[in-house]
C-alpha cells in the first residue's frame, strides 16, 4: 500500500557508487525516495522504545515471599519496637525492613511494560531512520569511524556469492573505507556490569556496521557475522532497533542493490 506524505525540507536525489567484490566502483545508483525524507529524531526515539519494550518479559514475585513465618507483634510495654517477631526469639520478621521479610513494592506481572505507537508513526520512523543512514553528520555523531566519501555504502548483489571468508570480507571493508569502525567495536569490547555476566551477557560490544542483505544465509553474510559489532538483517525485517541502536539515528550501513529495491517496495511512498 502506497502512502502519500506531505512533508517539507525534502532532501535532493542522491546518487551513490556501487562497489564490486574488490571495492572498486562498478556502477552508480539513485537512492530510493525514502532516503529523501527528513530525519525525525523524536519519532525514531519513540519507535525504538516501542520495539525495545515489546521484547521485555513481565515478571513478578511469589505473593507469599517473606510471609512464611509465624511471627507476631509482642505488643506494647516491653521496651522494644512493635514489629512482628519470631516466637521464642526477638528476631524481627515479615515486615519489609526485616531480614528475610517481604518486599515493600515488588515487581508485578500486571505492570504494562510496552510503550505503544501508532502504525503510521512507526512506519514513518523507520523511513526516517533509513534516511539517516545517508547523512554523514549523523553517522559521525553516533561515533562511527569511516573514510568513505559517500553514504550509504552500496554493494552489487553479485558480491553476496563471491565473498565467503572473513579475510575477503575484511579486504572489502578496508577497500570501501569502513573497516576502522569494526576495529573501534573490537577495542570497545568490555565486561558487562552486574549479574548479567552470569546470564549470557558477559561482554558489552559497541555496534559497528549494519549489513542489509536480501539473503541472510549468503556466503558474505556468514563471513561478516563473526566480526565485532556487525549485524546482518534482511530488508523485510529491518527496523529501528537495527538502524538506530539506543534510539540514536545514523548507523553506518551497507546495502546491496537488490536490498534497496526490496526496501523501496516495502516502503512504497508517493511524494506530492
Curated annotation (Swiss-Prot):
The keyword Cell membrane does not apply. InterPro entries: Ribosomal_uL4, Ribosomal_uL4_dom_sf, Ribosomal_uL4_euk/arc_CS, Ribosomal_uL4_euk/arch, Ribosomall_uL4-arc. Keywords: Ribonucleoprotein, Ribosomal protein, RNA-binding, rRNA-binding. Disulfide bonds: none annotated. Pfam families: Ribosomal_L4. GO terms for biological process: translation. Gene3D superfamilies: 3.40.1370.10. GO terms for molecular function: rRNA binding; structural constituent of ribosome. The keyword rRNA-binding applies. It comes from the Archaea. GO terms for cellular component: ribonucleoprotein complex; ribosome. Part of the 50S ribosomal subunit. Belongs to the universal ribosomal protein uL4 family. PANTHER family: 60S RIBOSOMAL PROTEIN L4. One of the primary rRNA binding proteins, this protein initially binds near the 5'-end of the 23S rRNA. It is important during the early stages of 50S assembly. It makes multiple contacts with different domains of the 23S rRNA in the assembled 50S subunit and ribosome. Forms part of the polypeptide exit tunnel. This is Large ribosomal subunit protein uL4. It comes from Aeropyrum pernix (strain ATCC 700893 / DSM 11879 / JCM 9820 / NBRC 100138 / K1).
Amino acid at each position: 500500500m502506497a502512502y502519500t506524505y506531505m512533508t517539507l525540507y525534502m532532501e535532493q536525489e542522491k546518487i551513490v557508487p556501487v562497489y564490486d567484490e574488490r571495492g572498486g566502483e562498478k556502477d552508480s545508483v539513485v537512492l530510493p525516495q525514502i532516503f529523501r525524507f527528513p530525519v525525525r529524531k523524536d519519532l525514531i526515539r519513540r519507535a525504538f522504545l516501542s520495539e525495545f519494550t515489546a521484547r521485555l518479559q513481565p515478571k513478578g514475585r511469589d505473593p507469599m515471599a517473606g510471609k512464611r513465618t509465624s511471627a507476631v507483634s509482642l505488643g506494647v510495654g516491653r521496651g522494644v519496637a512493635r514489629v512482628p517477631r519470631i516466637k521464642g526469639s526477638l528476631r524481627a520478621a515479615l515486615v519489609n525492613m526485616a531480614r528475610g521479610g517481604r518486599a515493600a513494592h515488588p515487581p508485578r506481572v500486571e505492570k504494562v511494560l510496552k510503550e505503544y505507537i501508532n502504525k503510521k508513526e512507526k512506519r514513518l520512523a523507520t523511513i526516517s531512520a533509513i534516511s539517516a543512514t545517508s547523512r554523514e553528520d549523523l553517522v559521525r555523531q553516533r561515533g562511527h569511524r569511516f573514510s568513505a566519501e559517500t553514504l550509504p555504502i552500496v554493494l552489487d548483489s553479485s558480491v553476496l556469492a563471491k565473498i565467503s571468508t572473513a579475510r575477503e570480507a575484511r579486504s572489502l571493508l578496508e577497500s570501501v573505507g569502513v573497516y576502522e569502525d569494526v576495529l573501534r567495536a573490537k577495542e570497545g569490547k568490555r565486561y558487562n556490569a552486574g549479574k548479567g555476566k552470569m546470564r549470557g551477557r558477559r561482554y558489552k560490544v559497541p555496534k559497528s556496521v549494519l549489513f542489509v542483505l536480501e539473503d541472510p544465509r549468503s556466503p558474505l553474510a556468514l563471513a561478516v557475522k563473526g566480526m565485532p559489532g556487525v549485524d546482518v538483517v534482511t530488508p523485510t525485517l529491518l527496523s529501528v532497533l537495527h538502524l538506530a541502536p539506543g534510539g540514536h539515528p545514523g548507523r553506518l550501513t551497507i546495502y546491496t542493490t537488490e536490498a534497496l529495491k526490496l526496501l523501496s517496495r516495502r516502503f512504497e511512498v508517493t511524494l506530492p
